[in-house]
Amino acid sequence: MKISKEEVKHIAMLSRLELNEEEIGVYQEQLSRILDYIEKLNEIDTTLVEPTSHVIELKNVFRDDNVKGSISRDEALKNAPDQTDKFFRVPKIIE
């Protein structure tokens, strides 16, 4: 599937990319090859393949939540450049 330069420019604009003419040509070729590959994938007969949500069976691999001790508030604030009433003080970034 051939992609046009206008389509590449549109994709670049949506991606907030500024491309020169050489780059547009490169992306035009690369995107065309990608779309050709996808077309080949669409030709594969998958009628005998059972639908799955994942290609490998996964189990819950999360660990249990366990409460563990941590450093104290004073220890955490020890190296803070600025603090107020046992809280970190950071520069204001929103007016």
From Swiss-Prot:
Coiled-coil segments on the chain, per record: none
Domain of life of the organism encoding this protein: Bacteria
Alphabetical keyword list: ATP-binding, Ligase, Nucleotide-binding, Protein biosynthesis
Presence of keyword Metal-binding: no
EC class name: ligase
Record keyword Cell membrane present: no
Catalytic activity line of the entry: L-glutamyl-tRNA(Gln) + L-glutamine + ATP + H2O = L-glutaminyl-tRNA(Gln) + L-glutamate + ADP + phosphate + H(+); L-aspartyl-tRNA(Asn) + L-glutamine + ATP + H2O = L-asparaginyl-tRNA(Asn) + L-glutamate + ADP + phosphate + 2 H(+)
An individual GO BP term: glutaminyl-tRNAGln biosynthesis via transamidation
GO molecular function terms listed in the Swiss-Prot or TrEMBL record: asparaginyl-tRNA synthase (glutamine-hydrolyzing) activity; ATP binding; glutaminyl-tRNA synthase (glutamine-hydrolyzing) activity
E.C. code: 6.3.5.-
Family under the similarity heading: Belongs to the GatC family.
Subunit structure: Heterotrimer of A, B and C subunits.
HAMAP family: GatC
Function of the protein: Allows the formation of correctly charged Asn-tRNA(Asn) or Gln-tRNA(Gln) through the transamidation of misacylated Asp-tRNA(Asn) or Glu-tRNA(Gln) in organisms which lack either or both of asparaginyl-tRNA or glutaminyl-tRNA synthetases. The reaction takes place in the presence of glutamine and ATP through an activated phospho-Asp-tRNA(Asn) or phospho-Glu-tRNA(Gln).
The protein's name: Aspartyl/glutamyl-tRNA(Asn/Gln) amidotransferase subunit C
